[in-house]
Amino acid sequence: MSSPDLLAISLLVRWLLGWFLCLRMPALPEFTPMGQPRVSVLIPARNEALTLPQLLAALADQSLQPLEVIVIDDHSSDDTAAIAPAAGVTVLASEPLPQGWCGKTWALQQGANRSQGELLVFLDADTEPSPTFLAHLVANHQQYGG
């Protein structure tokens, strides 16, 4: 037998062996898309008693309800801290500001540390989201990542 014949037989045997092994492999489970991510909405607030109720009402009317809404009260001198529990959301009293931090970013850091969601949404207290805001945000996140 010549060298090209041996090469052809070797390739044929390997090809057949590959198909045999491929057919013996277990099938992959059917793909099922992951569910909706759990969404935590974090709201830093300092003296937002006039605007916070509208935002909390808009969040209660979302077509996709968040796992949790956390208001981080950044040392307000008005009724901000009292408004949020009445709406059924969690309120965190901001801890003293560490050196090198700014108030809003420190408040958001504290909220992020306490949140339980996979997707964190940061909103200012004067935001007025549409009823489909969170649903669109999550859909875009699932489609494009983030």
Question: Locations of the language-model features?
Answer:
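Acidic helix N-cap motif at the loop->helix transition within catalytic regions
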Residues: 50-54, 78-86, 132-134
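The conserved acidic donor/metal-binding loop of glycosyltransferases
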Residues: 124-128
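Cell-envelope/extracellular polymer assembly enzymes that use nucleotide-activated donors
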Residues: 37-40, 68
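Conserved donor NDP-sugar-binding/catalytic core segment of glycosyltransferases
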Residues: 132-146
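N-terminal membrane-anchoring/stem segments of glycan-assembly enzymes
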Residues: 1-35
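Short aromatic/hydrophobic "clamp" motif used to bind/position activated sugar donors
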Residues: 108, 120
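A conserved acidic beta->alpha catalytic loop
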Residues: 65, 73-82, 96
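Short, acidic, metal-binding catalytic loop of nucleotide-sugar glycosyltransferases
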Residues: 57-66
